[in-house]
Amino acid sequence: MSQAIDAYLDYLRDVRRMSPNTVVSYARDLGALTEYASKHHKRVEALDRRDLEAFARRLMANGLSPRSVARAVACVRGFYRFLLGEKKVAADPAEDLRAPRAWPALPTYLDLEAVDRLLAQPDVSEPRGLRDKALIEVLYATGLRVSELLALKPGDINLEAG
């Protein structure tokens, strides 16, 4: 299979004109795929869709960033498409392969000192300043996103509940 990998990398470099860094990354991804197949006592050309999905999940579990996993999945899809075109495989197990969804990054938050500085900004002697300070207070007190705050309607607010 290393001949097929070398041929694919040559194709990426010479025909598709991919950057050297991309080709190196794809070589690393295909090396990881080969290692994964070997650990499961299979040849790369014998992997099926379930194997490839498990491979992508393994990359996530190993701490690769979602972007790196997405690149590896794109590499694997392209590689199997290449193998199919070269008649090295009868079917493309990666045809509909998608990268697993990552947990969304946790939002960053302001420390107490930054909140105090933010609350001190609006000029509360002006109606707009009062409005802005109220909006900032609601954001801080409730943890709403800005889009959620902007979507609030007067009927959504229960002033008696506090």
Language-model-detected regions and their locations in the chain:
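Conserved catalytic core of the tyrosine transesterase superfamily
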Residues: 1-162
